[in-house]
Amino acid sequence: MKKIASFCSAAVLIASSFLLNNTVQAQQILDRVVVVVDDGVVLQSQIDQLIQQVKNGQNFNSSNAPSDEVLETQAIERLILQEIQLQMANRMGIEIDDNQLEQAINEIANNQDLTTAELRENMVSSGMSWAAYRENIRNELVIQQVQRAAVQQRVSITPQEINNLVKLIESNQEVQTEYRLAQILISADSNSSQAELEKAKERANTVLNLLDKGSDFADLAVRSSSGSAALDGGDLGWMTVNGMPTLFAEAVDGKSVGDVVGPIRSGIGFHILKVQDKRGEQTVEVQEVKARHILIKPSVILSDNKAKEMLNKYREQIASGEKTFAELAREHSADPGSASRGGDLGWARPNKYAPEFKQKVESIEQDTISEPFSTQFGWHIVEVTGRRTLDATEENKQERAYQMLFSRKFREELDNWQQEIRDQAFIRRVAE
C-alpha cells in the first residue's frame, strides 16, 4: 500500500510539474518583443499596461473612444521614446534612489489631496500594481534628468533678454497670465517634401473640422497627435505667455477659455492648440522656518544605534535643564557650519533641506525637539524655533524672468531633441 501511495504521490507531482510548466510557458507566450530599440526592447505587456492606464485615466465615452489600434500605435511611440531615453540614462549613470522616489510619490499624493496609502489604493483598484506604479514614477524621474542634462545645454539666454523681460513684466500684467494648453501635433519635419507637407496640413484641417463639429479635443489628441503628451489628451499643463514657445504665445494672445487655434506651422509639424483654462497672477507667499539641529555622523566606530542613543541622551539633558541645546550643539554636532552657532540654521525655506529634514521641520510643533531621525548626512535632532510667511511676489525678478525664458526655450528644444534621438535610434518592429 505504501508503494502505491508513493507511486500516486509521484504521479501527482509529475502532473503538477507538467501543468506548472505549461502554465509558465503560456504566460511567457502571452508576452513578446514588439519593437527592438537599440540595445533594448518594447514588450507587449508594457504596451497593454500603458493602454489600460490611458483608458482608466481618460474615461473615454464608448461612442467615441479611440480604437485599440490607435491606442496601441500611440503607446508604442511613447514607449520607444521612453526606452531610448532610459538607455541614455543608463549610459550617463543617472539613477533615482528610493528616498527620491518616496519624496516624489508623496508630492504626487499631496497634490491630489490624498495620503500615500490612498494613492496606492487607487492605483491597485485601477488594475495597476503598486510596484509597477513606483517603477513608472522612477522612470519618469530618470527621463526628466536625462532631458535636463541633454536639452539645457542647447538653451542659450542672454542678459539682455532677461532685462527686457523684467521690464515687460513690470509694465504688462498680461504676461503674468497663465494658460493651460492642450495640443494636437500633426508631424511634418523640415525634411518633408512639399507633398508630405500638404498632406500633413490637410490632416490638421480635418482635425479642426472635427473639433468644429463638437469632437472631444482629448480624444482626438489620443487618436491623431504625434506630440509626447498625446496619451494625456494633449495636455501641456500650465505656462505663462513667456514660458511657452513663441509660436504658441502669438497664437493664444487674447484668446478665451475653450478657444481652439491653428494649424500653426513649426519645424516639426502643424500644431492645433486649445486654451483649456486661464488664471491671473497671484500673490506668492512662502513659508520659512528658523531651526537648529545637532548632527551625529555614524562611522566605522560609531554605529547607527549608538548615534541614536547619543541624541536621545542629549534630548533628556535638554529636557532636564542639565544642558542647553546650543551648548550640546557646540560640543557635539558634526555640522561645522552650524555647530559654532549653537546648531542655528537661520531662516530658510523647508525645501532647501534633505527630504527627511524638510518633512520633520514642516511637521513638528514649534519649540519642540524632534525624536532622532536619519538623513543622508547622518542622525539629527531638530527644533523649530520660529515660523514666518513672506510675500515673495516681487522677489528676484531676474530669476523669474530667467525661468520663464528657460521654460519657453526648453520646450522648443525638447521637441526637436526628441525627434533627433528617435531618428538616430535603431528601431525595428518584430513580426508576430
UniProtKB/Swiss-Prot annotation:
One of its GO terms (biological process) is protein folding. It is found in: Periplasm. InterPro entries: OMP_Chaperone_SurA (IPR050280), PPIase_dom_sf (IPR046357), PPIase_PpiC (IPR000297), PPIase_PpiC_CS (IPR023058), PPIase_SurA (IPR023034), SurA_N (IPR015391), Trigger_fact/SurA_dom_sf (IPR027304). Its EC number is 5.2.1.8. One of its GO terms (cellular component) is outer membrane-bounded periplasmic space. Disulfide bonds: none annotated. The PPIase activity resides only in the second parvulin domain. The N-terminal region and the C-terminal tail are necessary and sufficient for the chaperone activity of SurA. The PPIase activity is dispensable for SurA to function as a chaperone. The N-terminal region and the C-terminal tail are also required for porin recognition. This is Chaperone SurA. It comes from Idiomarina loihiensis (strain ATCC BAA-735 / DSM 15497 / L2-TR). The gene is surA.
